[in-house]
Amino acid sequence: MARIAGVNIPNHKHTEIGLTAIYGIGRSRARKICEATGVPFDKKVKDLTDADLEKLRDEVGKVTVEGDLRRETTMNIKRLMDLGCYRGMRHRKGLPMRGQRTRTNARTRKGPRKAGVALKK
């Protein structure tokens, strides 16, 4: 298995698809990386030479991926929460922040339903 940016790339997949195993690299960015390095994107990962892998490692190193990207995203959300802006408050409350309705739906963001309060008769 090839190892790029601390991630094992599946051997049996094409280079373009295999690179998407790295957090922060999708199909379009993987294709651009392959074009920039001159590595054919439809070549299987197991068929790549050491020189090809080294070129890919260098090109992926120029992009923010994996832990750095996760940390950056977390810090952006934390900054919004510290500012106390609308989006930050919605993050803090665990509600959708892009204007979706919450009277019904929004179950993914709000979590499972809580038991309702029973009224006395």
From Swiss-Prot:
Top-level lineage group: Bacteria
Stored InterPro entries: Rbsml_uS13_C, Ribosomal_uS13, Ribosomal_uS13-like_H2TH, Ribosomal_uS13_bac-type, Ribosomal_uS13_CS
Cellular component GO terms held in the UniProt record: cytosol; small ribosomal subunit
Region (Disordered), start-end ranges: 91-121
Keywords: Ribonucleoprotein, Ribosomal protein, RNA-binding, rRNA-binding, tRNA-binding
Keyword set includes RNA-binding: yes
GO biological process: translation
A Pfam family assignment: Ribosomal_S13
Disulfide links within the chain: none
Subunit structure: Part of the 30S ribosomal subunit. Forms a loose heterodimer with protein S19. Forms two bridges to the 50S subunit in the 70S ribosome.
Cited HAMAP family: Ribosomal_uS13 (MF_01315)
Family: Belongs to the universal ribosomal protein uS13 family.
Protein name as annotated: Small ribosomal subunit protein uS13
Organism encoding this protein: Cupriavidus metallidurans (strain ATCC 43123 / DSM 2839 / NBRC 102507 / CH34) (Ralstonia metallidurans)
